[in-house]
Amino acid sequence: MDKRIYLCLAHMSGKEISFIQEAFDTNWVVPLGPNVNAFEQDLERFVGQDKKVVALSAGTAAVHLALLACGVGQGDEVIVQSFTFCASSHPVTYLGATPVFVDSEADTWNMDPVLLEQAIRDRIDKTGRKPKAIVPVALYGMPYKIDQIMSVADKYDIPVIEDAAEGFGSKFDGQVLGTFGKYGVLSFNGNKMITTSGGGALICPDEESKKEIMFYATQARESYPYYQHERIGYNYRMSNICAGIGRGQMTVVDEHIAHHKYLCGLYRELLADVEGITLHENPSGRYDSNYWLNTVLLDGNLHVRGEEDAYRETVKGAVGGAAGVTHESVSAHTSCEPNRNVEAMRVCLDKAGIESRPLWKPMHLQPVYAANPAYVNGVSEGLFKRGLCLPSGPYVTDEDVRYIVNEMKKSIL
């Protein structure tokens, strides 16, 4: 195949350019503006539940401001799902608080509600205080067990900040993720379900909460004719130009989600006869994943071409800044890494022009968080060692999926 197949490329509706041109024609090329207002309204209609939405510069900013709004500060603890991207936990540290990591359950791969309650009780016993917030994550679009998580959170009166950055449009019992907890985080990075180039949003419970988030996102400027600041704020508002992209994207969001789900069905069909490879799917009818990225697990006894050399050339393609990776590693190995057959399959697919990547490395296994409290059961570590993400975006065709699965089969010994 001549072209390279990527995990999830941004797909334009064609309407984005008119909204962007409108911003240029009216000279609204700064943060805030008509596109931002309209994009927020589009998002509010999409998520429903009478929620309010603030468009922001990134999903990370949304996590940060949600934590701030929940009163998180110096010396506090926040429970965060360990199996996630670092943007779920890093903002906790921005506020001088400590992330406390909770492992996953095997059904959804997300925060284990039983382990969550154990963690809360233990933190109360050890510190004499409750954690200030709970952050579950919709990994690769899969809904978390939000009914059980909310039950635990309500029992201890702890606010929930849903990290639905990867789960835009995913639902549990027909309700959109991000609308169950006190706040919901969305991401519109270039590889997400919809994009604003870079950007995110925070789903808020009401208009008053939205105004408070907007206040902190615009440098916490007070309402005087001159610049008065009584609290520390941040430069987190979305550009009117980026919001124009978002408005165009909202015209095709349903189409995007449907395509990702369709690809999951195609992967299911084509991988059905492949022993040793398991596709992750909704555990029951209550779950409705957007399948942002389709993911598979490789059995430990599945042998793949090139296993013996799996980690010899990894860093060569990772360094250079194209994905923001600028630090060159001395060794390709760490104390915890995907199994050799997973890395070997990634390399085989890469040589065939197919992008794939391992699952997120759990935060409790990251060196930067080595000293943090963690409540683990081995689930996320096991998934990390066995899992691989496959191309799933709007530009991935039926022919592409057939080619991908065929190359996967060819790599198996």
Which residues make up each language-model segment?
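N-terminal "arm"/small-domain region of PLP-dependent enzymes with the aminotransferase-like
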Residues: 1-30, 391
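Phosphate-binding glycine-rich loop
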Residues: 32-77, 91-93, 101-103, 126, ...
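PLP-dependent aminotransferase class I/II
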Residues: 34-41, 50-51, 114-118, 125-129, ...
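Helix C-cap/helix->beta junction micro-motif
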Residues: 95, 155-156, 352
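Active-site phosphate-binding strand-loop segment of PLP-dependent enzymes
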Residues: 107-196, 201-203, 208
